[in-house]
């Protein structure tokens, strides 16, 4: 959700961070300097506006207390007007007759508050005119004005870093019929999307070069758009509905239908909009999206203080009223240039919801709050055709997007592409080709053969700018059979015959230049999870063994859980275009080995288990888990499982990670879990509910599952599979995490082999991965380095210590959720759809052993062993730039000024 922007000068960056910290401390009390309009006096009658479960007003006297009255005259809410003269009442029941009352008994006229039905209460709002080129404002159903810019294919947008003048010369000379009406796409996000210079973090230019008009729209509460910001609230989603229907009615829009396109924020927003199925929405193509908030913000139950928290801080900063130092820079530029509408629209920006308080209040899964924000809970409602692309190792949104494929059941016209790589690799040449075909067929209603000429001609320029490749590194589009069809019907038939899931392997090794965004080969499947997948188990054993055979003897090993043992992140350079997104020559990996003296658990900071060399090629596609029988010296401990490939040449390649806070170890075996599916052996789903939080039992081993994120990796015969268990940190470019450690590191012990009184009947520590049987690997080992977002290094063995002592074993506490158990979902084989063996039985058996905290079974009410005060202290350090990031490393994705990014 970030991109290659110009860094702020250090002084301005520091000033904005300090300003943000002060704002947080004063509860967002309206410190912005912008003055909009002339605030009303107490004698003026306020003008109220009824919205969807909201009432709002502007031009009110600052600091006045305003009451919201229902039809009976009863005060249902009251609050103070902010410094901009705005007030917003949320969570208001639908109904007529609401009024606002100012001091002195001055009241507004009555207004109606509406429910969240998709259809507007007055569809004449869609009759407004949208000019076919340039900048303007569109009015939504509740009167809020959204800023937009229309980019026609004859006047392409930019990537925010400028499109060379040769494009201006290409278009007129191709003889392409770029005449109205135009096939049209909408790009919708909370970044500076509508800026006339070209969208920040947008990809409108790519659609322009495909022959599409693009309408770039800024969400309410951002930039020059009116309204107040709240992360994907209902009104933001209904605004998208209104934008779609309004744009589709314009005479310059071909077929009076539109598609949606965008990457990251602009991809996620499509899922939220499409759940309402606007009648004029023809297709969506979400790229590099999230699946749920927890899998990005709270992986495994602990806070992502790296990218995710900083992204939230960016949203807080961007949603403030525009001034010389706050809000989105383009809005201030517009105001300074005389844009009175933009100035007036700042009046509600001070009513933005406190996003940091929302994070604090939802550290655990609360369905009523979380489900509306998690695409996995509602994508089944989407009926429009879908093209989606995501990366297993996406350094920003994370690798859980593929789970959406199994839940997107509302349409049979859906195609998914998955690969290893970085955030922008959903724009790799092969994926871009296929997305172009999709839009041509479902939005333009045209065969893609003619306009593909321009796309192929400009692709090297697009690739160079999107990924920041060096001059002379030319990446072109591959041949495409769909584009060879001469008629629309033939092209559509060929496209719809494509398998629904494409997995590209060894991305970065398919071009003569190592690291270019080109995969070595691909396989296709009918669904995700792959129906043929087999849950394949390797058991952990003594001396770091990882074997398909169960160990006959019990052994104990361990390590010191120390979050500071490795750097917080594994990349030291620019994490955008020209750095992490570039080719191998531009990478700056710092993937550090864990310290290991080999002399005991008090000095080791990790343990690892590694297989013998594989005798056959082994392809893994899907999730998986490390199941551990674990003991901790502290009431809680954070765990990270890292999967790597150890090659015969002595190098080690990163594959994927998984996370869990041990107090969140209870699994959810119902289809009402936060992922809306029950736990299986291959995909254990953490409950994450506060009621299911339990400290670790004292001096006792207990089962803990570490769910792995999605992966797609080819292990060639002769390679070995390794799993390393440690504290979080050091395996991600920009993800970092808070810590449970209460002043000193935890001593963690892992029991391998049979445990407990029942021995072989109890679960053993093991690694389970989804292996696709009989899958060919047609290429040789990729160079090291070359795989995108999969760093490699020289393999270094860890000497797991052997620890003495008795193995006392206890099952997990019972799950306290009361939902009906599910039989699971998704077709698999060889038991891969069964509940996690042993661990599932432990959950239902119940009975926690004695607690680390004098018998108290649960952690404090926050559900975390880190207090919110401590978290705010860590947050302050982040904001002031003294903790995880320096301005040079993270500034390009924090507090941006001006256009300069393709995706965030």
Report residues per predicted region.
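Alpha/beta-hydrolase fold nucleophile elbow
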Residues: 252-264
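Cap/lid segment of the alpha/beta-hydrolase catalytic domain
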Residues: 155-249, 603, 641, 647-648, ...
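C-terminal membrane-anchoring or membrane-association module
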Residues: 869-904
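C-terminal low-complexity, Ser/Thr- and acidic/Pro-rich disordered "stalk" regions positioned immediately N-terminal
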Residues: 810-862
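C-terminal, loop-rich substrate-recognition/catalytic regions characterized by aromatic stacking residues
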Residues: 429-443, 447-817
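Accessory cap/linker subdomain of secreted extracellular hydrolases
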Residues: 148, 197-201, 209, 272-382, ...
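Short beta-strand/loop motif that positions the catalytic acidic residue
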Residues: 382, 388-390
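N-terminal cap/lid segment of alpha/beta-hydrolase-fold proteins
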Residues: 117-180, 614-616
